[in-house]
Amino acid sequence: MTKHRFSRRDVLNSATALAATVFASPLRAAAPEASAITPALVEAAKKEGKLAFYTAMDLAFAERLAKTFEERFPGVAVRVERSGAERIFTRIAQEYGGNINVVDVVNTADQAHCIVWKRNGWLAPYLPEEVAKHFDPQYYDPDALHVTTRILISPIAYNTNLVKKEDAPKSFADLLDPKWAGKMVKGHPAYSGTIMNSTFQTARDLGWGYFEKLAKQRVLQVQSATDTPKKIALGERAVMVDGAGYLVIRNKEEGQPVEIVYPEEGTPLAGGPSAVFKAAPNPNAARLFQNWMHSREAQQLLVDWARQYSPHRQTVEKPGIRKLADIKLMKEDPESVEKMGDEIKMRYAQIFKV
């Protein structure tokens, strides 16, 4: 069977007719009022009995989240479909292009995806009550079409058995030192939303010339932002150029020899939004899951177990974890990522020859 590769531009082009004839509306609807989890919603969800959750979360946490939901709402099963954010984006485009409606709720690690899905008219408006009460408006769409579920950072990290603290890199510039040649690992922007945003922000702030120099360092290329922390924890490489900061924190807490570095130039940032699809085959179960996923209970699980940052104001960070406000961050720009995504992938592939 021939496999077709979809670019972001392909997604836009293939979806135009469908969006115009099926989903588009001549009038912009008012944002819905905030919705609580009601007995009626729970009962309707139980009648559907299931939902499909496409997510870029690491599999262990996605399954933990799904299991906790199933315990809270017996009779509603969650099927977790985990992949890299960019792969999820392509998969949904292929399914919708073939008039296949499978996904109920999506969580991505690339805000740019929601720009496309919203433009295509694929998302259902839904505003969970706790989002309206406890999330800053910057973390949810004004039309209530998507909500930032988690806030991700992509720092540098290293294996403490292989690198002494005093020798560890402190900046992206330090990674160009010849002593790190053949000792680093990096994720790929064509697979991971976190890495797509990290690559865009680093290229914007430091220039593509930085990556041209980095490529000469014989960097091991892997796919996911969740792969790079594993490589340094196992000692397969000494330094992580980018990747899931929360996994480095989790691995360190579990006793693995890893340490996080917040680079002097700034740490790349990526919001991880979730949305309910308008054509969801299980719309009530989808809304129940989306609502609960943004409750304080689920968001605290995100903080405590996944070690990720939450936009929910009532969550409490564990002692010893650096607060997001205390980290120098690069600026997220999903609009530019949406416009430049294909160019980023192409230029990256040319530089790293992958």
Which role does the model predict for each range below?
Residues 55-66, 78-96, 101-229, 233-236:
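Extracytoplasmic ligand-binding site segments that recognize negatively charged/polar headgroups
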Residues 112-116, 238-257:
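A ligand-binding cleft/hinge motif common to bilobed small-molecule-binding domains
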